[in-house]
Amino acid sequence: MIDKYKIVSLVLTLSLIAALVRLVYSTNIAGPSAPQDDKASVLKIIHERKSVRSFTEQPVSREQLDTLVRAAMAAPTGKNMQPWKFIVIDDKEAMTQLSEQLPYAKMLKEAQAAVIVCGDMSVVDDNGKPSTNWVMDCSAATENLLLAAEAMGLGAVWTGVYPYEERLEAVKKAFNLPDNIIPLNMVPIGYPKGEQHPKDKYKPDNIHYNGW
């Protein structure tokens, strides 16, 4: 006669084994898929980034601004010189005044904050020479900042300062910048007003493989 308790014990054991098999299988499946999801998210952010020039009155916190600048500083630089400085502005009066001096940056009146990305000529290499790549390095930092803003649900736009003399003078004067600091651009930041759509800039004709 079959012991019913042994049968129950056997069923429970088999159920436990089946559960463990499912757990191991699902873990193996989920492992490789997670990076794929991350890649998809990164590519989505890159392709959805857009220049936002109109903002709501919703404030942007200093914690959010710090996150943006941290992302900017994660950019690559020649010789790892990191020849940059970042001026974070969340003073509405200062931004309004600057928007009146810089006709191309009228969106500063609506923005809740801005970041000025600057090259620092006091940063030198092992030979005592300042970076010759500061424009490229600071541009990479700016793109990181713009992508981070997109990922955080914020809007931003790259407004050029360098190499326009009148813009350089206006920004340097407004923020008392020393001679070794050159503002490359200014990025107004805020929450987008209305629906914004990215532009599809992909053009196959611009691609050449293995030569022209």
Whereabouts are the PLM-identified features?
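Acidic, surface-exposed loops and disordered segments
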Residues: 1-212
